[in-house]
UniProtKB/Swiss-Prot annotation:
Annotated positions binding Ca(2+) 2: 200, 217, 219, 222, 224
Organism: Pleurotus eryngii
Residues annotated to bind Mn(2+): 66, 70, 205
Record gene name: vpl1
Location(s), subcellular: Secreted
UniProt-recorded name of the protein: Versatile peroxidase VPL1
Length: 361
């Protein structure tokens, strides 16, 4: 066999091996933790005992209840304390580390309760307050039917200073003011809409103190599109007292509507994106997870953090389908997006009902 023939054969064999390597991906080695669970990075093993502890002792056995709602709120109130011009460390845990300062900010009214609930877990486990806040929020959302696995990165350093005041948007702020504040932190108008999917599993305690634990939609224990549907219905009543700052009329007894949500659902800058979330569970899940991950990294250097996203549990499947509440029809929708028709939805059977408060509020 000539040298030229041998060379051609070697090249052919090399190409075949290269093709085979490309066709059969290498199996990624996973770390086995002390309790037998596995993760992509051994540094993430420290999270499994924390996961078990908060599921049992903070979230009442992995429920999607009041503590989940408040933990998710805390992720935002800590992280949005960030401005390139005004300062703030972002998602650094300052709202826990400097709680005597930040919980007294007017926009953080009522958040002292979840801060007090989380502080013992931070003290007990080897984790920074910034990491714990974002980890607890991600785990909490995963408890909700229809929820998402929000990416989680470990390794935030301890906060060195309190956030400045006036960085958290208020429910009585104008749309332009809210969008300007969020733009300052790096978020576009559509990303603001995506973040507000959090209100699908949220409630208000302080907007109307006479009715604590009043949810923003009729399914506060399910991560779904009902919030985006029901905020577009005509307001009929105040579920408690009237004339509360930051409150608009709600369509249902037992459901509260923030003035900011009412306006964002109808503003030309956000109305079409708002409507696009109706009955679009994959979009809600994908956009919310991506934007929450972005928010959780405000003020942080991602290259210095460890991706521990695989520790976050897989959420239960969505329960139920998008619908109009009983007693409503499409004529009750105050459609603000002229570009596309409002999705065709049917109403639940029966008369108009009342939404119960979130248990444990």
């Amino acid at each position: 066999m000539s040298f030229k023939t041998l060379s051609a054969l070697a090249l052919a064999l090399g190409a075949a091996v290269q093709f085979a390597s490309a066709a059969v991906p290498l199996v990624q080695k996973r770390a086995t933790c002390a309790d037998g669970r596995t993760t992509a990075n051994a540094a993430c093993c420290v999270l499994f005992p924390i996961l078990d502890d908060i599921q049992e002792n903070l979230f009442d056995g992995a429920q999607c209840g009041e503590e989940v709602h408040e933990s998710l709120r805390l992720t935002f109130h800590d992280a949005i304390g960030f401005s390139p011009t005004l300062g703030g460390g972002g998602a650094d845990g300052s709202i826990i580390a400097f709680d005597t300062i930040e919980t007294n900010f007017p926009a953080n009214a009522g958040i002292d309760e979840i801060v007090s609930a989380q502080k013992p877990f931070v003290a007990k486990h080897n984790i920074s307050a910034g990491d714990f806040i974002q980890f607890a929020g991600a785990v909490g959302v995963s408890n909700c039917p229809g929820g998402v696995r929000i990416p989680f990165f470990l390794g935030r350093p301890d906060a060195v200073a309190a956030s400045p005041d006036h960085l958290v948007p208020e429910p009585f702020d104008s749309v332009d003011s809210i969008l300007a504040r969020m733009s300052d932190a790096g978020f576009s108008p559509v990303e603001v809409v995506w973040l507000l999917a959090s209100h699908s599993i949220a409630a208000a305690d302080k907007v109307d103190p006479s009715i604590p634990g009043t949810p923003f939609d009729s399914t506060p224990g399910v991560f779904d599109s009902q919030f985006f549907i029901e905020t577009q219905l005509k307001g009929r009543l105040f579920p408690g007292t009237a004339d509360n700052k930051g409150e608009a009329q709600s369509p249902l007894q037992g459901e509260i509507r923030l003035q900011s949500d009412h306006l964002l659902a109808r503003d030309p800058q956000t109305a079409c994106e708002w409507q696009s979330m109706v009955n679009n569970q994959p979009k809600i899940q994908n956009r919310f997870a991506a934007t929450m991950s972005k928010m959780a990294l405000l003020g942080q250097d991602k290259t210095k953090l460890i991706d521990c996203s695989d520790v976050i549990p897989t959420p239960p499947a969505l329960v139920g389908a998008a619908h109009l509440p009983a007693g409503f029809s499409l004529s009750d929708v105050e459609q603000a997006c002229a570009a596309t028709p409002f999705p065709a939805l049917t109403a639940d059977p029966g008369p108009v009902t009342s939404v119960p408060p979130v248990p444990g509020s």
